[in-house]
Amino acid sequence: MLFRSEVDGAINSDPVGTNTDGSSTIVQDGTLEINGTTYTVRELASQEMKNSAGATWDAATAGNAINTWSASFGDQIDVIASNNDGMGMAMFNAWSSANSVPTFGYDANSDAVAAIADGYDGTISQHADVQAYLTLRVLRNALDGVDIDTGIGTEDDAGNVLSDDVFYYDEASRSYYALNVAVTAENYEDFLDSTVTDAPVSNQLDATAHPTKSVWLNIYNAADNFLSATYQPLLEKYDDLLNLNVDYIGGDGQTEANITNRLSNPSQYDAFAINMVKTDNAASYTALLNQ
């Protein structure tokens, strides 16, 4: 395993740039013993995949990065780990597929899962079906004035309830979390369609007991593969089941104003689900909602 330095008691997640000589102060080499042989594990290179316009998690930038790295030290690259499938697939298609270098991503996007049959080595499903449900279910419960756990850990009047193995609630942060699951060559066929709702929470709410409400929901980057191709389609399926009339706003992944400029009349909505470009920009939204 690798050992990363700490900053103020937390693991330092900064990218190392290039670290082919192992001299980085951010990450230290690790070792791995297999069949009596000890191997050095080194983070050769890492960077934030941000394009020239400022958009992060950028697939094209990742594809360019692996081409640059492979030209400089490609024979040293034994495995690629990407923080999302959009970037992982860009590197897989640009270089690692042709060079048989194991590549792993995150998100379990449909194209990445399908690519496992063609050599993409694996990804992580963050249970987008559960994430999307939780997003809208918390809003539905708040609008109905019922216990926040209704239809989540506690069965609702339509029979909706999540199983314990797909989510957990953290009391300290008052947050629900969907649990991750590895997607590999052994189970990828179960994840080929990433837009299927979770069956135990796919029961229609009664419109009399749960009348239609209007919701404004934004996604910080409409160009993000996971958000646009997996998360939003799931939201659109659940909003019908939960009797929510949702206006979806897709941002550019760069500026808060691109989103807030499209919230001109907050009073027409009953609830809001906000996905900020930067997590320290909450005031941009609360200022509008307080008008």
List where the protein language model places each region.
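A residue-level marker of the well-folded mature domains of exported/periplasmic proteins
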Residues: 1-291
